[in-house]
Amino acid sequence: MARYLGPKLKLSRREGTDLFLKSGVRAIDSKCKIDTAPGQHGARKPRLSDYGSQLREKQKVRRIYGILERQFRNYYKEANRLKGNTGENLLVLLEGRLDNVVYRMGFAATRAEARQLVSHKAIVVNGRVVNIPSFQVSVNDVVAIREKSKKQARIKASLELAEQREKPTWLEVDSAKMEGVFKRVPERSDLSADINEHLIVELYSK
């Protein structure tokens, strides 16, 4: 399945919630009917079956993190293999992706922009360039903007924007140095309550 390149707002309207795919503290302003399906008049949303609800939740999370179907399924398999709660393990793996950490640290306004920074070799982990967005960041890893990329206006703008967002407690960021430390693995209580990972587990358990 190819990566979606169309309007970001359309995806948020499809899922009925703000997926934070656009730059800004909130991706969608008050004039946009987020609870209305895409289309000129907004298609009426049918009542979902259990399977439909599970599928929608999986699609929502996959789109939030910008992950293709096969890769998302592999994350689920890895989460299921690990000890503990499979759903929580899945979210922890997704949060540990380098592109997500770059976004969470405020170096990019969106995860898509963070993925681009990583792919363009603007990010270093423990002093070494890493250009793989799915790279798993470990506890105590230092993630920073590469020296020659620090003058990019979009990075500075993103850091200013990040000051308006709630700062993740599992990360420690030095905005002046443009670097941060992955202090600990996030707990479920640290992450979005708008995600129902149990529905995803039910979907893949069938």
From Swiss-Prot:
Residues 96-156 form the S4 RNA-binding domain. One of its GO terms (cellular component) is small ribosomal subunit. One of the primary rRNA binding proteins, it binds directly to 16S rRNA where it nucleates assembly of the body of the 30S subunit. SMART domains: Ribosomal_S4 (SM01390), S4 (SM00363). Keywords: Ribonucleoprotein, Ribosomal protein, RNA-binding, rRNA-binding. It comes from the Bacteria. Belongs to the universal ribosomal protein uS4 family. InterPro entries: Ribosomal_uS4, Ribosomal_uS4_bac-type, Ribosomal_uS4_CS, Ribosomal_uS4_N, S4_RNA-bd, S4_RNA-bd_sf. GO terms for molecular function: rRNA binding; structural constituent of ribosome. Pfam families: Ribosomal_S4, S4. It comes from Haemophilus influenzae (strain PittEE). Part of the 30S ribosomal subunit. Contacts protein S5. The interaction surface between S4 and S5 is involved in control of translational fidelity. The keyword Lipid biosynthesis does not apply. One of its GO terms (biological process) is ribosomal small subunit biogenesis. This is Small ribosomal subunit protein uS4.
